[in-house]
Design a protein with these regions (language model features):
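N-terminal helical capping/dimerization or prosegment-like subdomains
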Residues: 1-87, 92-95, 346-348, 449-451
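Generic non-transmembrane alpha-helical segments
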Residues: 9, 18, 22-29, 52-60, ...
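Buried hydrophobic packing segments
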Residues: 53, 125-135, 164, 228, ...
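A generic structural motif
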Residues: 72-74, 226, 258-265, 346-349, ...
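Active-site metal-coordination/substrate-binding segment of hydrolases
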Residues: 82-150, 156, 443-454
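Acidic/histidine-rich catalytic neighborhood of metal-dependent amide-processing enzymes
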Residues: 121-200, 233, 237, 241, ...
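Acidic-enriched catalytic cores of C-N bond-cleaving enzymes acting on peptides and small amides
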Residues: 185-188, 192-212, 217-267, 271-332, ...
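An extended, acidic, His-containing surface patch that forms the Zn2+-binding/catalytic region
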Residues: 268, 272-342, 348, 352-364, ...
Length: 468
């Protein structure tokens, strides 16, 4: 029921314009987590985005509530809540390499809307709000309530949603449009240890004095830079040319006195799909291990890292933890953070682990590999999340997807964690269509406007079927 009305509602050109304007209003706000301020647990940016999201909901006539700038809740009616839809308004940092537009200046090109958050997850917020508006405008009677939850800390640990559920109960049904269609019912676990090594300060040259790589644990680093004491650009350039051909990264050399500054540029990607990017940290280490450096502590540590994380190894083979199972696929690994100075280093990788992974075949193996080179590693594992495919929620969502997409519905397993990872019975549902790559977390992030409109149709039908 209601398919013809829903199609007609969203096929109106005015609806498309409304969607673009709503997403753009949210994207213009830089909602990256920063230091907490009074009443703003994740800083002013996420709080400002939440205020705008709640304003959009109120403009559509919905009751909205701000949970202390952690989460915003938007209710369809005052009945018992049957469905929670979880979206988030925070974004990862802008990074570098944008070419179509600036990160917070949304622009439409060839049916795609570009800007940080268009795909993850401000576009889906707008699609859900429009779906709720459609159900209301079409006069569909709902016996139960649907509540949209707009979070502000999904990218940095989901403290927001934990705060909300410490005060409010779970709903019988929960989905999050923070993934892709059809339905994601299995999310891999994760292992993200911090590893360290120290050594005595030394003055021999050439040596690496400092190195900085990456800006967020769940982003494959697009850039890394270092300072090499006692080496000229002329001496380093042949090594750079060879390493660039081997790795696919670019190196920029700048001399400042006796120091050589090296900037390595790769390609950013989400840490759960490292094969879609080019890791600047491992690309820089690859070069440094080829240079004629002095035999000092930093040189030995870099050679150890090169052995443990060779450039292009996104499966954890060298570390000894590569594994896979039929249900959830292979382990993936992104070496995403590294800081090094004259007396030590600290790094962290983000691995998404299959159901078959455990502390014995993953954590213990990695710690032993680190120990072999004199590193210490600390950090536990997060369990996978799984909701059976035959639950009423999943079967209903798949039916709605098939109804409006014309494609076969099926369940998927992913490496990325979504808001529902710790919510019993929850699944990720949209907004990306199969095969679409919006370069989430990378430069020129974008969403397909037509796909977002289709997603809004699907969500409207799902709200009706689950709450009607």
């Amino acid at each position: 029921m209601y398919q013809d009305q829903i199609n007609a509602y969203f096929d109106d050109p005015a609806r498309r314009q409304q969607l673009v304007e709503m997403i753009s209003r949210l994207v213009r706000i830089r909602s990256v987590r920063e230091e907490a301020q009074p009443g703003m647990p994740f800083g002013p940016g996420p709080a400002a985005a939440l205020a705008e999201g709640l304003k959009l909901a109120e403009e559509l006539g919905f009751a909205a509530k701000n949970y202390d700038n952690y989460v915003g809740a938007v209710d369809f009616n005052d009945q018992e809540t049957q469905l929670h839809i979880l979206c988030h308004l925070d974004v990862v940092g802008e990074g570098t390499g944008w070419t179509v537009t600036e990160p917070y200046e949304p622009v439409e090109v060839d049916g795609m809307l570009y800007g940080r958050g268009t795909d993850d997850d401000k576009g889906p917020v707008a699609a859900v709000l429009l779906a709720m508006q459609a159900v209301k405008d079409l006069g569909v009677p709902l016996k139960k309530n649907v509540r949209l939850l707009m979070g502000t800390d999904e990218e940095s640990g989901s403290e927001d949603i934990a705060y909300y559920y410490s005060k409010e109960p779970y709903a019988p049904c929960t989905f999050s449009p923070d993934g892709e269609f059809p339905v994601i019912n299995l999310e891999k676990g994760s292992y993200k240890p911090v590893f360290t090594k120290t050594w005595a300060a030394e003055s021999a040259t050439p040596r690496v004095k400092e190195l900085h790589g990456g800006f967020r644990i769940n982003v494959l680093p697009p850039e890394a830079q270092c300072v090499v004491a006692g080496l000229s650009a002329q001496a380093a350039r042949p090594y750079c040319d060879k390493a660039a051909a081997e790795t696919g990264v670019a190196y920029e050399l700048t001399e400042r006195g006796d120091d050589l500054h090296i900037l390595c540029k790769g390609k950013g990607a989400h840490a759960s799909t490292p094969e879609e990017g080019v890791n600047a940290i491992t690309g820089l280490i690859h070069l440094l291990c080829a240079l004629p450096l002095a035999k000092v502590g930093s040189t030995a540590a870099l050679h150890a890292l090169n052995a443990l994380f060779p450039h292009g190894d996104s499966a954890g083979k060298a570390l000894g933890i590569a594994q896979a199972d039929q249900m959830s696929g292979p382990l993936t690994l992104a070496f995403s953070l590294l800081e090094l100075n004259d007396t030590g280093l600290s790094g962290q990788f983000d691995s998404r682990v299959p159901v078959c992974a455990n502390e014995d075949n993953c954590k213990a193996v990695a710690e032993a590999a680190f120990a072999k080179f004199g590193f210490a590693a600390e950090g536990g594992m997060q369990a996978p999340h799984y909701t059976p495919a035959d639950t009423p929620l999943v079967t209903t969502l798949l039916k709605c997807y098939e109804q409006y997409s014309g494609r076969k519905g099926e369940c998927l397993a992913i490496g990325g964690g979504t808001y529902v990872h710790d919510i019993p019975g929850g699944v990720a549902f949209g907004c990306a269509m199969p095969g679409f790559n919006g370069n989430m977390h990378g430069p020129d992030e974008h969403t397909c406007i037509a796909d977002q409109l289709t997603a809004a149709k699907i969500f409207a039908q799902a709200i009706i079927d689950l709450c009607g």
